[in-house]
Structures are given as C-alpha cells and as structure tokens.
C-alpha cells in the first residue's frame, strides 16, 4: 500500500474508531455520528486550550511544562464516562517512543522483547478476574491474552492519589481491580466531575493511540489496586490484533459467494457486526428444525452437516442423522434457512475445536435491509447451493420430520 497517498492522521483516526466499534453499538450510523461529533468538539476545546489559555501541567518526570511544548497524548479515559474523544495533535511534541506512528498493517514482524512482570499465583488469579470483562481483551486469543497478562503490573493507590492528570503524556492503560475513582475535567479554569469508577472498569486506552494530552484527571477516592499495561505492549498486541481481525473478517466476507452481489460498502457493514464463537468437538452449533437466527463462517476447524434420515433409525428408535456435507475453514453454513425463511434444514456439529464467525440475522437486516431484498440480487446462486448441499429432492418444507 506504499503507493497510495494516505492523509496524515487517517490511520490513527480509524484505529480509534475501530476499537470503539468493538463495543458492538446497536446502530453503527448513530454511533459514528456521536463519535465523530465528540471528536470535533475535543479538537475545538484542544485549540482553545493551546491558543487561549497557556496553562501548564505537571508530569511525573518534570516540573511545570507549557502545554504547547508537551503536546502529547489524549485519553477518553472511559468506555462509559461522558468525555470528549481525543484527536491527533496538530502541534509538534518532543520525540519519544510514545509518539511514534503505529501502522498495524505495516508492522508484520515483531522482534521487540516481551515485557514480563513476574507475579505470584495469587496475583495472577486476581488479575485474571479483573480482566475477564474488559471489552478490549475479548477478541484476543489465548496466547495474546497470556502476553498481555504477563506484561501487566500491579499499582497500589492511596486515597486522593492522582493516577493520571489531564495534560500529561499517556503511557499506560489501566484496569481497575478495586477502589473508587473520580473522573475530573478542567475547562476554562473550572474543574468538574464527569463520572466515577466503582471497583470495576478500565481507562487510558485512547491515550495509547492518539498524540494528544490526557483529556481528564483520575483521582482515587479510596485505597485501591490497578493493573497497568504499557503503551508499547498495548499497541503491539491489542491495536494490531483488532486491525488484523478486521482485515481477516473482510477477507472472509469477500470470499463468500453469498455476498458477491453486495456493494463494497455493504460488505464493510457486515464486518462491523460479525462476532466470534468457539465450539468444542462434537458440540452442536445449529439444530435441524430450530428457528434460524445466525449465519456462520468457519474461521478455523471443521464442521459436519447432518440431516435426519427418513428411512434410517438410531438405537433409540428416532431418525438417524446422516452426514451430507463436511465444511472447512472459509466455508459457511446456516444461511439457507435465512434465505428460505424456514427452520434449520440440517444440524451442524464441531469436528474438533472450531472457531466460527457469527452474524446475527437481526443485525444483518438492520444494516442492509430485509435479507430477501439483498439476496434476490443473486438468487440463482442459492438454488445452486440448495442442490449442491442437500440434493434436488430434499424437502425443506418440513425439516422437523
């Protein structure tokens, strides 16, 4: 992609939006409007801060420093708090590792030494418990999550301690294990509380992606414990993983014949509502006769498609299931019932451990309109698929028989 002229700041802008979309908002258009509106307001306020009010902030490493010289990184500091989303800085800051441009698509090779902070078994258990509901960690595989946990360090805080200060450089992402914390924002020399954390949550993630100062101050209102993750590890694993996941999802969607008739913009919308699910060997993924509510693409592993025979019986006297197809990575299943608007015509079982990309039909219809309106563009393909997978004589009218 080196021959394509990418506007300065676009990569960081889209990285931030991509991470935020991981929250699975119900309406992507409304979410985008709200996100970029806050982004614009943050830029205006940042401009006011630098041009109108030459306030100074204190960092952990130095004495008072003029903001215009220390234009560093910003932070939304909360998934839930009502804070402005930061934007890439227009000013020049000192050269540091923290400010280096990060493009996850270009940095395929990673030779940096792994950061490891030794922990006792008890600390590891507490850390895992604190991180189990952190949205940013949801899409990490086991190896990546293990590297993140290895790199995190415990920080014990006291009452009234400033964890981060508005205007400071942002070097760490924090997960709350325990304690309460106030979120304070100063504007026009007026400081106000915009929210509070109560023994759960995380903050500081966007400061690791944008070149603007911290957007808020976080103060402990009780004794507590935090787990920190350094900027380099955060970007190397989490940001890069999100970018790779999205790229992989796009590749899968483009390879599915079912979506050949969709416009590029429509396929990109599909990527935004895809989730992942893992199934164990022999686990049933869909059941014949059940209502169809999801469509599946195999990310890794194999899936066996079976249908109940009308002529063969199992040992319990019921209709025996007979395999009619064996699906592998990149193949998909579960879409035919959505197209025909009928119950599942077959069952699907995992063969070994299986990871599937899952698309909810309601999300699909919300983004692209009723399924049939979209699918009619390529209806001949579905007829071919029906014959290929189930045979021309298969009765789909009553899959429960």
UniProtKB/Swiss-Prot annotation:
Q: Matching Pfam families, A to Z?
A: cNMP_binding (PF00027), RIIa (PF02197)
Q: What InterPro entries does UniProt report for this protein, alphabetically?
A: cAMP-dep_PK_reg_su-like (IPR050503), cAMP_dep_PK_reg_su (IPR012198), cAMP_dep_PK_reg_su_I/II_a/b (IPR003117), cNMP-bd_CS (IPR018488), cNMP-bd_dom (IPR000595), cNMP-bd_dom_sf (IPR018490), RmlC-like_jellyroll (IPR014710)
**Which portions of the chain have biased composition (kind: Acidic residues)?**
68-83
* Binding site residues for 3',5'-cyclic AMP 1: 136-257
Question: Where is the PTM N-acetylserine found along the chain?
Answer: 2
Can you name the source organism?
Mus musculus (Mouse)
* UniProt record similarity statement: Belongs to the cAMP-dependent kinase regulatory chain family.
Keyword flag Transport: no
> Found in which tissues?
Four types of regulatory chains are found: I-alpha, I-beta, II-alpha, and II-beta. Their expression varies among tissues and is in some cases constitutive and in others inducible.
Keywords linked to the UniProt accession = Acetylation, cAMP, cAMP-binding, Cell membrane, Cytoplasm, Membrane, Nucleotide-binding, Phosphoprotein, Repeat
PANTHER family named among the record's database cross-references: CAMP-DEPENDENT PROTEIN KINASE REGULATORY CHAIN, CAMP-DEPENDENT PROTEIN KINASE TYPE II-ALPHA REGULATORY SUBUNIT
Q: Which GO annotations describe the biological process of this protein? A: modulation of chemical synaptic transmission
According to the record, the segments passing through the membrane are none
Full protein name: cAMP-dependent protein kinase type II-alpha regulatory subunit
A single cellular component GO annotation: plasma membrane
Q: How does it assemble?
A: The inactive form of the enzyme is composed of two regulatory chains and two catalytic chains. Activation by cAMP produces two active catalytic monomers and a regulatory dimer that binds four cAMP molecules. Interacts with AKAP4. Interacts with CBFA2T3. Interacts with the phosphorylated form of PJA2. Interacts with MYRIP. This interaction may link PKA to components of the exocytosis machinery, thus facilitating exocytosis, including insulin release.
Region Disordered, residue ranges: 61-83
Which Gene Ontology molecular-function terms are recorded?
Answer: cAMP binding; cAMP-dependent protein kinase regulator activity
* PTM notes: Phosphorylated by the activated catalytic chain.
Organism taxonomic ancestry: Eukaryota, Metazoa, Chordata, Craniata, Vertebrata
Which residues bind 3',5'-cyclic AMP 2 per the record? 258-401
Location of this chain's protein in the cell: Cytoplasm; Cell membrane
Q: Which PROSITE patterns does this UniProt record tie to the protein?
A: CNMP_BINDING_1, CNMP_BINDING_2, CNMP_BINDING_3
- Gene3D superfamilies documented for this protein: cAMP-dependent protein kinase regulatory subunit, dimerization-anchoring domain (1.20.890.10), Jelly Rolls (2.60.120.10)
Q: Does the keyword Isomerase apply?
A: no
Modification Phosphoserine, positions: 47, 74, 76, 96, 347, 392
